[in-house]
Amino acid sequence: MIETERLFFRKLTPEDLPWLIEMRSPEPVNRYLGGTEKQNPEALAVRLKFYISCYDKFGFGNCAMGLKSTGELIGTSGLQPLEETGEIEVGYNLSERFWRQGYGFECAMGWLKHGFKNCGLDRIVAVSYPENTASWRIMEKCGMTYEKTDKHYGINCVFYSISREDFLSKWGAEQN
């Protein structure tokens, strides 16, 4: 499992469901994750099973993310396939009190490095609501470029991507 300067990551387990429900229930957090319709306990139980199944199928998946300094879980992030296309997506979401502290960029970079170095991926995508400027600014800061606006789970979203070659060009060979 990867780690960054301030963050650790671990596989999600079925026992994480109550924490996941609590973390994603506030409106500021779930509004960019499909709202309460997609973040209710029943939907999250199904989603958690998908996250867990990705580990065995692909060797990576969405993970619990926590602070090394305290052990506190602060969100989820990871690499996973987009259900519609199979493209590998880097995703991240944080509890609101951990926003604007650089954790989004730190975890996204950690997963991009891992995807290109350890998983042999040639391209990674990211998806966000157009209104979620904080998320797509992280994508741009990581070197990802806008590709299109298209439907994702029936909702208009912006799609960004970065290739291994572009990542290495921006961040150097030491990142891989």
Model-derived segments and spans:
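Acyl-donor (CoA/ACP) binding surface of acyl/acetyltransferases
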Residues: 1-32, 49-50, 62-176
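Active-site rim helix/loop that mediates acceptor-substrate recognition in acyltransferases
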Residues: 39-58
